[in-house]
Regions:
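Glycine-rich acetyl-CoA-binding "A-motif" of GNAT/NAT acetyltransferases
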Residues: 66-69, 130, 156
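Conserved glycine-rich acetyl-CoA-binding loop
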Residues: 80, 89-107, 125-133, 137-138
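Short hydrophobic/aromatic beta-strand or adjacent loop that forms the aromatic wall/cage
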Residues: 56, 157-161
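Short, intrinsically disordered C-terminal tails of secreted or membrane-associated proteins
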Residues: 223-229
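Intrinsic, low-complexity polybasic segments
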Residues: 177-186, 190-192, 198-202, 206-211, ...
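Conserved catalytic-core motifs of GNAT/GCN5-like acyltransferases
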Residues: 121-125, 136, 141-158
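Conserved GNAT acetyl-CoA-binding A-motif
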Residues: 113-123
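Acetyl-CoA-dependent GNAT
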Residues: 10-21, 25-95, 106-108, 112, ...
Length: 230
C-alpha cells in the first residue's frame, strides 16, 4: 500500500454509508475492542450515523473512495470536565494495517483536540502492547488501570487509562521550534509523515457548539485499539 495515496480528514454526513459499513465491520470482527456491539448498532439506519458525523468529530483514512480506518473525538460530559476530550472508536481494516494508518488517525485526533481541549484521554486493553507503545511514542502517559473493564462472552478485559497533556505539548513544541520539525515528543530523526493528514479545525457541533458523547456508543467507549490495527 502506498501511504502517499492515503488522505486523513474529518468525515461529514456525506460519508455516512461508508462510515456505517466500517464501523459495523469493526464491531463484528473485533468485538472485544469496543464498548458498543454489532447487534445494537446494526439496527441503526444510515441517518443515525450521519447525525453522529454531524455532531461529533470523527476522522477517516481514505484511499480514493475506500474508507480504511476511523477514529473519533468527543468531550467529557459536564462543565467541570469540559476541558477533557476522549479518543474513541478506532478501527483500521486488515488490509491497511502496519502501514501507518493507525498512527495518522491518532495524530489527526491530537491535532484537532489541541484546538478544543486541554487533556486527551483514552483507554486500551492492558495486553495490547503494540497500541500502548504507539500511544507512548505520541506522548500519552499511563495513569490508571480499570480491572474487568469489558466483558465479552466469558472473558474479562482490563483497561489501561492513558492521557496526553495538550498544554504541555504546546509548550514543548514552541521550545523545540528552532530544532526543526518534531511531532509529539518524537526524536530528531522524525521524518515527514508520508500521507496527507488534514485535521480541519472547525466547530465540533452543527451550530458551533462543543461535541458531547451523547450517542450510546460514545458514552461507554473510548479508544480500545485492536493490536492488529496499529
Amino acid at each position: 500500500m502506498n501511504a502517499k495515496d492515503i488522505e486523513v480528514r474529518r468525515l461529514t454526513p456525506a460519508d455516512a454509508v461508508r462510515y456505517r459499513e466500517i464501523r459495523l465491520a469493526g464491531l463484528k470482527n473485533s468485538p472485544e475492542a469496543f464498548g458498543s456491539t454489532f447487534e445494537s448498532e446494526s439496527l441503526k439506519p444510515s441517518s443515525s450515523f450521519a447525525e453522529r458525523l454531524r455532531s461529533s468529530a470523527i476522522f477517516g483514512a481514505l484511499r480514493g473512495a475506500e474508507l480504511l480506518g476511523i477514529a473519533g473525538f468527543a468531550f467529557r460530559e459536564g462543565a467541570k470536565e469540559a476541558h477533557k476530550g476522549l479518543l474513541w472508536g478506532m478501527y483500521v481494516r486488515p488490509n491497511a494495517r502496519k502501514s501507518g494508518v493507525g498512527r495518522r488517525l491518532v495524530e489527526a485526533v491530537i491535532d484537532f483536540a489541541r484546538q478544543h481541549a486541554e487533556i486527551l484521554q483514552l483507554s486500551v486493553v492492558s495486553d495490547n502492547e503494540p497500541a500502548r507503545r504507539l500511544y507512548a511514542r505520541l506522548g500519552f502517559v499511563e495513569y490508571g488501570l480499570e480491572k474487568d473493564s469489558l466483558k465479552h462472552g466469558d472473558t474479562y478485559y482490563d483497561e489501561i487509562l492513558m492521557a496526553l497533556d495538550l498544554k504541555a505539548l504546546d509548550v514543548k513544541e514552541r521550545v523545540s521550534d528552532a530544532a526543526g520539525p518534531r511531532r509529539y515528543g518524537q526524536p530528531e530523526a522524525w521524518q515527514e509523515r508520508p500521507c496527507n493528514t488534514v485535521a480541519t479545525v472547525s466547530p465540533v457541533g452543527p451550530t458551533g457548539g462543543r461535541a458531547s458523547a451523547r450517542d450510546e456508543a460514545t458514552q461507554s467507549e473510548v479508544l480500545r485499539l485492536d493490536p492488529r490495527a496499529v
